[in-house]
Amino acid sequence: MAQASSQALPASTPARSPYLVLFVSWLIPGGGHFLLGRRGRGAIIFLAVLVSFAFGLMMRGAMFQPKSGDLLTTLIQYGGFVADLASGLFYLLSVWLGYSQEDMAGHSHDYGAKFLVAAGLLNILAMVDAWEISTGKKD
């Protein structure tokens, strides 16, 4: 008997385009999991990213902007910008509504910036998870 060469999605997972799932996962944290029928996991991801992002805003954390300079400064600024942008709609709404904090000295501001970055990095992990589920590499 010949085995099927392609990996089929489990019966509980609706067939969705992996690119659509990836885009929705970026735009709305946990949204890709909702599309795939994983509502519990999607809600947990949404709340985790939202709480982390909200704490960062409440601590008046500065969002990274792409700036050039020496190699380390450029790497930190662009990496932080990508991580902030990975928060999806939360980042876009905060920028569109005019949130802008200057990078200033202080522990709470520094922690706030780290919470904003952590929210984006957590959403990147969720995007990878949703991608793997939608392509059948993970149950």
Task: Identify the role of each PLM range.
Residues A2-L22, I45-D139:
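Transmembrane helix recognition focused on a "late"/terminal membrane span
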